[in-house]
Amino acid sequence: MKTLFVLRISTVILVVLVIQKSYADILECDYFDTVDISAAQKLQNGSYLFEGLLVPAILTGEYDFRILPDDSKQKVASHIRGCVCKLKPCVRFCCPHDHIMDNGVCNDNMSEEELTELDPFLNVTLDDGSVSRRHFKNELIVQWDLPMPCDGMFYLDNREEQDQYTLFENGTFFRHFDRVTLSKREYCLQHLTFADGNATSIRIAPHNCLIVPSITGQTVVMITSLICMVLTIAVYLFVKKLQNLHGKCFICYMVCLFMGYLFLLFDLWQISISFCKPAGVLGYFFVMAAFLWLSVISLHLWNTFRGSSHKASRFFSEHRFLAYNTYAWGMSMVLTGITVLADNVVEDQDWNPRVGEEGHCWIYTQAWSAMLYFYGPMVFLIAFNITMFILTARRIIGVKKDIQNFAHRQERKQKLNSDKQTYTFFLRLFIIMGLSWSLEIGSYISQSNQTWANVFLVADYLNWSQGIIIFILFILKRSTLRLLQESIRGEGEEVDNSEEEISLENTRFDRNVLS
């Protein structure tokens, strides 16, 4: 019995020792405060002499793994590490101390000429708040064998006001422009070549991981918006009374908006990366088509109140929807064709739309070429819509006055009120859509200013919410819900295909306008 007890105790002790050896090699020491000291001199008492620093045995351990920045473990050859950063301040390098960084890649040993150009000093902020200028190799321990923080990195040039930073004695790093504090697993330093006029210099520069904004909020809003777009289209297809010319144009607009936002969502999730350029072209086509259909709606509203009794106008009225389709889809194809042609022919990057470049399956919106191919047409169409809505408002006021001089005033007044409601709802649509896209243009113009970029983030969320806003405006209003209930009960299935025109010579009463 005693033998069995001793055996169990021995087993427990062995397991504890194995676990401690594997998972707690150096007690109370962060892996990112250690360096590989396998090549250092080992003393009889188990201590190591590393770069003139005595590392006691209690601060050493044998590792057969390395910890990656995401806290996962990667199997490596067994080696000895020392918690030297507890004994002397460390500086976290991306590569060996005599290598130079070039486009995020570590290059081999620097030449003698490069070594003479190197500025080896760093400004280190001490615990008492004072700043000390220290030689990176003679006064600090260089940690160069830690895993790279990430694949994509950018460097900071502290000669620029927006690239200022503070390096602390304990290894933490403070980035000034967004006031973010980084640990040693999130940044690294390395020698980098800088242009100084006609000459070059080599200095130690911090490299940070590319800032990838969280897409959770955008994803939730865009998915909700897309669902609302589908519901809006479904209601307009289901309720026959909504399928007059206004309704048909509105359905086309919603389909274009849905497809454009779907490709934006694919780009956000990087689903379209395998067919990036075609996805960017299709997304551009549908967004431009959405703007053109919005201009069709504003033009049709103006034409509705303008009215005409000419034979040519009546002939056009019978084929108006076909004409609108030809204009909207045709102009979208023309704009897309010009963009694709420029993308393949224009060599100057300042004039090339650069579809599918810089990691985004869309037109490159960080350059001024976007104003020519994307925001320019957008500004023109917004200006056109504003003009049409102003002219329509003036016509409504004029018709309202003229009605007083004709017989059947009550019928004409009802017709005018119905069309006014249609105008009001589409005016709201344009104000919201036009405002959101106008803010988007403002965001594009001020993108180099971080403060204004944060302000215009509101515009982004407003843009992503367009489907939700349209659903509330057009579906959740009382008259549409009433028509939906009637359609579900099988009532009011007739569609009035007559044109919704206000003409002083020939006015027809139409109950089926969207109201």
UniProtKB/Swiss-Prot annotation:
The gene is mth. Homodimer. Involved in biological aging and stress response. Essential for adult survival. It comes from the Eukaryota. InterPro entries: GPCR_2-like_7TM, GPCR_2_secretin-like, Methusela_ecto_dom_1, Methusela_ecto_dom_2, Methuselah_N_dom, Methuselah_N_sf, Mth_GPCR. Changing E491V: In strain: HFL4.1S. Pfam families: 7tm_2 (PF00002), Methuselah_N (PF06652). One of its GO terms (cellular component) is plasma membrane. Glycans are attached at N45, N109, N123, N170, N198, N449. Disulfide bonds join C29-C83, C85-C90, C94-C188, C95-C106, C150-C209. Keywords: Cell membrane, Disulfide bond, G-protein coupled receptor, Glycoprotein, Membrane, Receptor, Signal, Transducer, Transmembrane, Transmembrane helix. Residues 25-218, 270-278, 342-370, 446-454 are extracellular. Changing V15F: In strain: GA2.1S, HFL2.1S and HFL4.1S. The keyword Disulfide bond applies. Changing G442A: In strain: HFL2.1S, VA7.1S and VA8.1S. This is G-protein coupled receptor Mth. Changing L27P: In strain: GA2.1S, HFL2.1S, HFL4.1S and VA8.1S. It is a multi-pass membrane protein. PANTHER family: G-PROTEIN COUPLED RECEPTOR MTH-RELATED. The chain crosses the membrane at residues 219-239, 249-269, 279-299, 321-341, 371-391, 425-445, 455-475. It is found in: Cell membrane. GO terms for molecular function: G protein-coupled peptide receptor activity.
